[in-house]
Amino acid sequence: MRGPQLSIHLIGLPGSGKSTVGRHLARRLGLPFIDSDHVIEQRIGGSIRGFFDREGEAAFRDLEEEVILELTEANVPPQVLATGGGVVIRPGNRTRLRERGTVVYLNASPEEIFRHIRHDQTRPLLQVGSPLDRLRELQRERDPLYREAAHFVISPERGKNVAALVQHIAMQLELAGIRPPSP
């Protein structure tokens, strides 16, 4: 099985909790937390939504792939990495994330995500007439890709708090021998 020094890569739909869970999981595991979307925003000097509107999705995916390559280099120390919801669209990203760490798919339902993000104006792919329908469409399109990349699929239960979810993920990593048991 894998050694205890691997990075943890979180994937899932936009709004599935990757950044929130990632921050708490990193603290729990004593690892740095990186959000690839924040790295991209620093690089472009603005919002992803603005970049999407100006440059288009293809240009964004090119930049995202470049950032994922950098964040998963062999010399990068172990970390918890929250990725953008569409990172799995590019086959190279799926392979890279899977080979360079342990991939955890946060498989939240579109309905649960919608409850959490319905007022969020920062998510470019959800700025449509029916965000819930768009989330369902993204789930249908991307679920097979998330599963292809994932080592673990975690389905957050409605009402389950972040601490309980982080505990569940940490326990799965420990049981698989990927992380040492918590003190």
UniProtKB/Swiss-Prot annotation:
* Annotated PROSITE patterns: SHIKIMATE_KINASE
- Cystine links in this protein are none
Q: Which family does it belong to?
A: Belongs to the shikimate kinase family.
Reaction it catalyzes = shikimate + ATP = 3-phosphoshikimate + ADP + H(+)
One Pfam family of this chain? SKI
Query: Membrane-spanning residues where?
Result: none
The record's listing under CDD domains reads: SK
Lineage runs:
Bacteria, Pseudomonadati, Pseudomonadota, Betaproteobacteria, Burkholderiales
EC numbers? 2.7.1.71
Cited HAMAP family: Shikimate_kinase
Name of the protein this chain belongs to:
Shikimate kinase
Cofactor, how bound (note): Binds 1 Mg(2+) ion per subunit.
What does the entry list as the binding residues for substrate? 37, 61, 85, 142
Q: From which organism does this entry originate?
A: Paracidovorax citrulli (strain AAC00-1)
InterPro entries linked to this entry: P-loop_NTPase (IPR027417), Shikimate/glucono_kinase (IPR031322), Shikimate_kinase/TSH1 (IPR000623), Shikimate_kinase_CS (IPR023000)
Q: What does this protein do?
A: Catalyzes the specific phosphorylation of the 3-hydroxyl group of shikimic acid using ATP as a cosubstrate.
Tell me where on the tree of life, at the top rank, the source sits: Bacteria
Positions bound to ATP: 15-20, 123
What is any one of the record's Gene Ontology cellular component terms? cytosol
- Keywords in UniProt for this one? Amino-acid biosynthesis, Aromatic amino acid biosynthesis, ATP-binding, Cytoplasm, Kinase, Magnesium, Metal-binding, Nucleotide-binding, Transferase
An example Gene Ontology biological process:
amino acid biosynthetic process
Location of this chain's protein in the cell: Cytoplasm
